[in-house]
Curated annotation (Swiss-Prot):
Transmembrane segments: none annotated. The lineage of its organism: Bacteria, Pseudomonadati, Pseudomonadota, Alphaproteobacteria, Rickettsiales. This is Chaperonin GroEL. It is an enzyme of class 5 (isomerase). One of its GO terms (biological process) is protein refolding. InterPro entries: Chaperonin_Cpn60_CS, Cpn60/GroEL, Cpn60/GroEL/TCP-1, GroEL-like_apical_dom_sf, GROEL-like_equatorial_sf, TCP-1-like_intermed_sf. The gene is groEL. GO terms for molecular function: ATP binding; ATP-dependent protein folding chaperone; isomerase activity; unfolded protein binding.
Length: 550
């Protein structure tokens, strides 16, 4: 068993805070319209250049175990903000560092950490309510474009393309991002469908950074029943391996030996495969699988038609340009279905909607209709070099997630202004003791830090700007770091999604509370000698039929 290193009290927290400072210093330079780039060495290929806070945070691992524990806690705040709202990662990092550092000073001075936490929680909840009150719903294309522009670090073209994509497929529609084969940045609407079923095993993931399985030009097998044994499928699996194309299996379920065998062959490289459960239940499941079959020009393998798995060949499989599978959703893009057949299916569903008297059935039929006829908007991101394309694609994905958040919960004044003005409402809060009041004071001071950092990155004095803004009663009055002017942020189009600001604060406070209430830290003791790297097994399974193991 590995021996452990145990640290207690302020010494443990101080070392954790050193790790937090290292990560925060690397991330904070990216904040605001004049934030700087960060260059990250890759294990292979050219270095990555990014202005995305969470990408910077994810790249950092520290050698010292205790400092690394602090850095990883801070990283979790940035990652959570990105997962929930798609943006606000750098703001969450700056806030968490400020809250944790000030909180630790007070704990060292003898304040009760639990009361400090209670005071911080009271303050955060009050600010969240103020953010909700201040938020303004967005409807126009111009407002959507403004959010996309700001979330992509001032790239107006990205904002406009996202607004156009939402106009094409609706605000709730499916929008995906892919790399273009040329210099241009285009929006293309293609046949496609998304349903709420994810991969059956994380071992199907092909992109570990985003935890998604991406299948290019795959075959799609649609099977009505459960798959528990792959023996009847051997002929079709061998044919797919020979074609050197991926395979997506959609069935009622894939379980036991069948799932284990698919995973083993996926890991050995013999078969590029992923499996998902079919969407829906009962008769509705069968109807949705038939929709997918028509969309992809495949056949639903069902015993009703006397079809058996052992008799299936390549011609019975559907195809699509691309399939992306996350933990929760599957998106089929540009299925190769016949246009006339899809139109006929749409008309059939419309007639069923007209005939049904059940509101529930009508709702489910309308969902199917939207999936089949709505299409998928594809944002194709181009550039002069591979590094440029990847960096811009990251920003497009972040901006898209932030724009969806803005549509969901509305927008507030950007540039750190909403948090700054919200801090002024906290002076009226009533608490039980001076320690809780100190917790509120920590939050009041920390809420100034994002704006200070934006101003500092623009080359000005953050403290001076904060003082000037607090002299005004107008909650939308702020500092435009791009033009270096004091403006009405909403009128100037400098807006943030309310969900992004709210999530950044809540995640930051959560991490800071953990740090100031930590009294003991246990980590693995560093080893005196480096352990040899284990040899990677399973290489013999690569390629061709030799990779199959059924």
């Amino acid at each position: 068993m590995t021996t452990k290193l145990i640290k207690h009290g302020s010494k443990a927290r101080e070392q954790m805070l050193e790790g937090i400072d290292i990560l925060a210093d690397a991330v904070k330079v990216t904040l605001g319209p004049k934030g700087r780039n960060v260059l990250i060495e890759q294990s292979f290929g050219a270095p990555k250049i990014t202005k995305d806070g969470v990408t910077v945070a994810k790249s950092i691992e520290l050698k010292d175990k205790i400092r690394n524990a602090g850095a990883q806690l801070l990283k979790s705040a940035a990652t959570k903000a990105a997962e929930v709202a798609g943006d606000g990662t750098t703001t969450a990092t700056v806030l968490a560092r400020a809250l944790a550092r000030e909180g630790n000073k007070l704990v060292a001075a003898g304040y009760n950490p639990m009361d400090l936490k209670r005071g911080m929680d009271l303050a955060v909840n009050a600010v969240v309510e103020e953010i909700k009150r201040s938020s303004k719903k967005i409807n126009s294309q111009e407002e959507i474009a403004q959010v996309g522009t700001i979330s992509s670090n001032g790239d107006k073209e990205i904002g406009e393309k996202i607004a156009k994509a939402m106009e094409e497929v609706g605000k709730e529609g499916v929008i995906t991002v892919e790399e273009a084969k040329n210099f241009s940045f285009d929006v293309e609407v293609v046949k496609g469908m998304m349903f709420d079923r994810g991969y059956l095993s994380p071992y199907f993931v092909t992109n570990s950074e985003k935890m998604v399985a991406e299948l290019e030009n795959p075959f799609i097998l649609l099977f009505e029943k459960k798959l528990s044994n792959l023996q009847p499928m051997l002929p079709i699996l061998e044919a797919v391996v020979q074609s050197q194309r991926p395979l997506l299996i959609i069935a009622e379920d894939v379980e036991g030996e069948a799932l284990a065998t698919l995973v083993v062959n996926r890991l050995r490289g013999g078969l590029k495969v992923a499996a998902v459960k079919a969407p829906g239940f009962g008769d509705r499941r069968k109807a949705m699988m038939e929709d997918i079959a028509i969309l992809t020009k495949g056949e639903l393998i069902t015993e009703d038609l006397g079809m058996k798995l052992e008799n299936v060949n390549i011609k019975n499989l559907g195809t699509a340009k691309r399939v992306t599978i996350s933990k929760e959703n599957t998106v089929i893009v540009d299925g190769n279905g016949d246009k006339k057949n899809i139109e006929d299916r749409v008309l059939q569903i419309k007639s069923q909607i007209a005939e049904t008297t059940s509101d529930y059935d009508k709702e489910k039929l309308q969902e199917r209709l939207a999936k089949l006829s709505g299409g998928v908007a594809v944002l194709k991101v181009g550039g002069a070099t591979e590094v440029e394309v990847k960096e811009r694609k990251d920003r497009v994905e972040d901006a898209l997630a932030a724009t969806r958040a803005a549509v969901e919960e509305g927008v507030v004044a950007g540039g750190g202004v909403t948090l700054l003005h919200a801090s002024q409402t906290l002076t009226k809060l009533k608490v039980e003791n001076k320690d809780q009041q100190a917790g509120i004071e920590i939050v009041i001071e920390a809420l100034k830090d994002p704006l200070k950092q934006i101003v500092k990155n623009a080359g000005e004095n953050g403290g001076v700007v904060v003082g000037k803004l607090l002299e005004h009663n107008d909650k939308n009055y702020g500092f435009n770091a791009q033009d270096m002017q004091y403006v009405d942020m909403i009128k100037a189009g400098i807006i943030d999604p309310a969900k992004v600001v709210r999530t950044a604060l809540q995640d930051a406070a959560s991490v800071a509370s953990l740090i100031i209430t930590t009294e003991t830290l246990i980590v693995d003791e560093p080893s005196d000698k480096e352990e040899p790297m284990p040899m990677r097994g399973g290489m013999g399974g690569m390629g061709g039929m030799g990779g199959m193991d059924f």
